[in-house]
Amino acid sequence: MGGIVLTPAAQADVDEIWDYTLERWGLEQAETYTRQLWKNIETLAEHPSLGKECSEVRPGYRQYPSGSHILFYRLIPNGIDVVRILHERMDYQRHFP
């Protein structure tokens, strides 16, 4: 498997997704949802070209759906750098520096 790097913003996104899902739907769903999120991240590390290029967001970025969220990442030597994990209804441009 390729390496996985999460930016601090992406880690904060994971934490927020966990907290929201726990509060809204309970522990079991929070565990299930975040486990699937991590499985998708691991799949992308193994097969980084699965995601669709999204240069309109930022040059070099790719995106991949995971449940109601979109994983935004870029390729790095030996793996992927997960930049953000945003809800599909969010205005993506607002969340990138």
Show which residues each predicted segment covers.
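Arg/Lys-rich, positively charged N-terminal/basic patches that mediate binding to nucleic acids
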Residues: 1-34
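Short, hydrophobic secondary-structure boundary micro-motifs
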Residues: 30, 52-54, 94
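Short proline/glycine- and basic residue-enriched helix-capping loop/turn segments at helix->loop/beta transitions
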Residues: 42-46
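Basic/aromatic recognition patch in beta-strand/loop cores that engages polyanionic ligands
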Residues: 49-78
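Enriched for short, Lys/Arg-rich terminal
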Residues: 69-70, 74-97
